[in-house]
Amino acid sequence: IGDDFQKLYPGANILVATKKDFQKANRQQLFAKIATGNYDAVIIGHSQLGKIPVSKERQVMTIQTQIDDILQGIEELKKSEGSKFQIKAMERTRKSLQKQLDKLEKANQDDTLTFEQLGIDRLFIDEAHEFKNLFVATKLQNVAGISNSASQKALDLFLKCRYLDEKTGGKGVIFATGTPLSNSITELHTMMRYLEYDFLRDHGLQHFDNWVAVFGEQKTDYELKPAGNGFKERTRIANYTGLPELMSMFKQVADIRTADTLKLDVPDCDYQVVQVEATPFQQELVQELADRADAINAGNVDPTIDNMLKITSDGRKLGLDPRLIDPSFEDNPDTKLNRCVENVARIHAETAEDRLTQIIFCDLGVPHKAAGEAEVEGEDADDVKDKKSIAEVESLEEECDFCVYDDIRDKLIARGIPAEEIAYIHDAKTEQQKADLFDKVRSGEIRVLLGSTAKMGTGTNVQKKLIAVHDLDIPWRPADLEQRAGRIIRQGNENKQVQIFRYV
C-alpha cells in the first residue's frame, strides 16, 4: 500500500509502520514520531490500530454508556413483564461490563501517548467489514442474525471514530469495503453507528432495538435443521419497512458503487458448479449425524461429549472427504477433493505455454500446526495473543488428522505437476515471505496456490496470471465467498475469461 500511495502522490510525506515498530519496546518511539512528524499519511495494519490506546477517560465513558443502556433495557423488560431469561441474560452482560469498568478504573494510566494526542484528523479504514462485531445492547433474544458477541477491535475503532467525529464535525472517518453487509441487513445499523452516530442519536435510533422497531419486523418460520433431518421454527428479522427512508439515511454517508457502475477492466467469469453425488457410505454417515442431533435435542447427551457444533463440523468434513472424519476411510475417486484434483491438473496442462496460475481455497484439513498457529518469527507477545484470539473466536480453519492440502499436492505431483510449482499460503510465516510467495505466483513460477479464506481471502493480489479459482468447501459467510472471488475477478488480470469452480 505504501508503494501505491507514493505512486499516486509522489510529493507526499508518508510513514509506513512495520510490525517491529509496534513491538512493545518500540511503540513509544513510533507514537512520538507520529505526534511530532509532519506526515501526510501514516499507514498501519488492522491489528496495529488496536495497539494505539484511547484515553482512559473515553473508555470509561463508553463502557458506562453501555451499562446505562442495559439497565434501561432491564427496567423496560420488568415493567412489561418480559422473559426472566432475557432479564438474566442482560444482567450477565451488565456484570461483565461492570467488571471491565472496575478493572479499567483501577488501572494506572501510563505515559504512552494516546490516539487523541497523535494529531490524527482523518482515519481511512480499508476492508472495514472486519470491524462489524460492534457491541449491541438489545432486549431481543433468540433472533437469528442478531449477534450479541462483541470484539475488542470493533470497540476500539468505535471509540476512535467518536473522537474524530467530535474533532471534525462528523467528517473524520472514511470506510472502504466491498462487503458492508456479510450476514444480515442489521449490520447496516453497525455501519451507521460508526459513520453517522450523531444523526442516529438526533433521531432516537442509536439503540438497535429502536432502529429495528422502525425498519424491521420479526418473522417466525420453519427452516431446515442443521443435521438435515427435518425442520424447526426459527425467528429472524425477515421483513423490512421504510427501506427508501433507510437507504436515504445511509446514503448520507455511503457512496455506493457496483461492478456495473464502475465498469472496471476485470475478466468475465464463468462459474462452474461441480456437483458430486453422495456415496452410499456418505449417506449412511449423514443418517448417523441426524441420529446424533435427535439425541442431543432430546437431552440424552452430555454437551461435553457431543453437541450441535461438533455435528456441524463433522457434516462439513463429510461433505468434503470422509477421511477428514477418519483417515482410514476409503479414498473414493468421486469425492469433491478428487474432482478438484482432476480439474486443476487439466487446466495446468492446457495453460502450460502461458504459465497461468490457479488458487484452491479450503478451510478444512489445513496443514498441521497451521490452524490457530500463533508463534511467528519477529512478533511480540501481543501479536501472538491477537492471533490466538482470532483462531479461537473465528475458528475459520480446522486442522484434522487427515491433511487435505498434502493429499491434493501429492495427487497433483503424481499427475505430472512439478512439486516446486505448488505452494501453501501457510508456509509464508512473515510478511516478507508472503510478498515473495505472491511475486512467484504473479510471475507463474508457482502455478498452484492452496490457502484458506482467513489467510488468503483479503489482501491477496496474485491475479496477474490467475485463470481459475477452486472453492473446495463453502465458507461460513456469503461475504467470504465474495472475497474469494475477488482474488480473480480483479483489475490487473491478464486473462479476459476466467473460471470459478464450486464443488458441492
Each model region followed by its residue ranges:
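A solvent-exposed, charged loop/short amphipathic helix patch at secondary-structure junctions
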Residues: V60-K79, V136-A150, G372-E399
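Conserved Helicase C-terminal RecA-like lobe
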Residues: L264-V448, A454-M456
